[in-house]
């Protein structure tokens, strides 16, 4: 078993990180469209940005006035910076980092369950990253109701992967203080339950 950061750093070196955009683009597009449809102008952070593909895509929107990516993998951030000179990237532990200015929208795809206590990260983002009236939106494929995902921790040999139910994730948002919480599944097919999306307003 290896740490999530080491595993994803190895993915950069092997080029496997590029598959993340292909595999997750539909879910991310669904989330970003929902989160930005009523915003004329917004600031954006991608929590666990990987090689920066979401930041690059969002920053191309005329409505986005600033885009920032944060990730714990130095290899991922190095690649992100090499591909994108106009956005801001930080290599740091998400639990320790705070933006200079709070933002309108924080997005995260396939990240939160790699933390020992994701509920603390959600609370940290609520307290320190998001403006009043701002939104957190997250997507995960690794959750209790998505049976095919149950073997992933063993398959990928990752030391920390926390399995929770949809109800648990909604409670994490509620306990952090978020309001108007919504959840849905995107991309359900056969025995695949789809990406679980949870979002709320501060």
Please provide the spans of the model-predicted regions:
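A short glycine-rich, Lys/Arg-flanked "PGG" loop and its adjoining helix->strand segment in the class I
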Residues: 119-132
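Core SAM-dependent methyltransferase catalytic element
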Residues: 185-202
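Conserved class I S-adenosyl-L-methionine
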Residues: 1-37, 144-145
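Class I SAM-dependent methyltransferase SAM/SAH-binding core
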Residues: 45-96
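Conserved beta-strand signature within the Rossmann-like core of class I S-adenosyl-L-methionine
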Residues: 133-141
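Short, glycine-/aromatic-enriched active-site segment of Class I SAM-dependent methyltransferases
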Residues: 141-160
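A conserved beta-strand element that flanks and buttresses the S-adenosyl-L-methionine
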Residues: 107
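Short alpha-helix
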Residues: 161-176
């Amino acid at each position: 078993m290896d740490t999530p950061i080491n595993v994803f750093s190895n993915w950069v070196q092997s080029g496997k990180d590029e598959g993340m955009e292909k595999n997750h683009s539909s879910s991310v597009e669904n989330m970003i469209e929902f989160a930005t449809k009523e915003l004329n102008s917004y600031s954006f952070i991608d929590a666990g940005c990987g090689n920066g593909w979401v930041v690059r895509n969002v920053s191309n929107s005329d409505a986005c006035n600033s885009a920032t990516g944060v990730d714990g993998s130095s290899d991922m951030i190095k690649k992100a910076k090499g591909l994108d000179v106009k956005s801001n990237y930080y290599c740091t532990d998400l639990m320790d980092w705070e933006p200079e200015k709070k933002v309108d929208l924080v997005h995260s795809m396939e990240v939160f369950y790699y933390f020992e206590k994701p509920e603390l990260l959600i609370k940290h983002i609520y307290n320190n990253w998001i403006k009043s009236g701002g939104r957190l939106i997250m997507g995960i494929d690794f959750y209790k109701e998505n049976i095919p995902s149950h073997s992933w921790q063993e398959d990928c040999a990752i030391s920390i992967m926390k399995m929770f139910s949809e109800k648990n994730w909604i409670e994490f948002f509620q306990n952090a203080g978020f309001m108007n919480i919504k959840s849905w599944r995107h991309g359900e097919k056969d025995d695949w339950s789809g990406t679980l999306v949870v979002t709320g307003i501060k």
